[in-house]
């Protein structure tokens, strides 16, 4: 499988196809008028009060239409002529002393899927030439606050800052073969890193050691950046969805024994594309009885939800199904009590599963085009990052979870509307579980799905790796 992926990635990133996709969506805003798309790369900048460069992250709209990771660059796409021009910085002799020769225009032409490559000092003359060739009736589409003061749109009939960003973000929802290969590669590297993290738990005494094993494996395999700050949460820390400390001891101060589970939510970024994977590590090679019970519920939630995926499925329906499975499992354990339908309608399960089932994935971890409604008064759907039907070619995370967060659950216990559905005597046995989340990255296809994530999640395999 990965040999075929590497063969695809040996080719050029399909920037021209992406430009054409964006151009098609811009037609209704042009009214037959010629136009251009203008995008800038991220600028190099220094850390505040320092002469060191700040961490660089390429602007996603620019990368989507260029495949170019270089800072201080820009592009122009002539919509009428179907000509994509990349502009890269010229040689700065003083910078060569420190950093060596930069990429030449000839090298860039060979590497990127563009029609021509010029240097940035030629930008304004090129813009003037384009607008002149169209008789001064061209529209320039660009993104607000992402245009340098030195860029000149003299002669253009209109400069539209309002529509391009949204058009690109919607175009990014459906991935092509090359993008899927990038996401699969990011997942493959991240799976190796998760295995390394699981094995590291055997000797680790602090969360940071597990984080270090994950990051080191990503870098060694070609993913130099993380998709997001890793979450490495032992014990009750796992009840915090975006826990970020990653510096707690794995030794329980009461028992002086190792805490028995670590939630790790982490993914490497490969050539701008992200993986986003969550696993729970049975520290010492064995889940506690309570953690295993919750893990089985969450794995069932994920298994059934992934099986529902195909082109056109309503994501809200999949999310609601996850809650149904959670309710059944928690009823069986005795944490919840009462009728399933009543618990569902009263939204009591939100106390244990407060977030959305998943989000689009691509160049951003929480990728664009999901149309969330964070003002939704229905607490079950308020934090669902994707609303509506899933198109074939979209990649979505499926990440159900069950959590025992006192801050979230205690108001439900105190409320007369919901406390009758929660058995606190049974619940008290599960606080130390913290949280269980299982997350995979799944490609939606016409008739089903393709799970891009290969990191182990079966209980026997996790326990074997954690014991090795």
From Swiss-Prot:
Its cofactor is Mn(2+). It catalyses: Release of any N-terminal amino acid, including proline, that is linked to proline, even from a dipeptide or tripeptide. Its EC number is 3.4.11.9. The keyword Manganese applies. It is an enzyme of class 3 (hydrolase). Keywords: Aminopeptidase, Hydrolase, Manganese, Metal-binding, Metalloprotease, Protease. It comes from the Eukaryota. PANTHER family: XAA-PRO AMINOPEPTIDASE 3, XAA-PRO DIPEPTIDASE. Belongs to the peptidase M24B family. This is Probable Xaa-Pro aminopeptidase pepP. It comes from Aspergillus fumigatus (strain ATCC MYA-4609 / CBS 101355 / FGSC A1100 / Af293). The lineage of its organism: Eukaryota, Fungi, Dikarya, Ascomycota, Pezizomycotina.
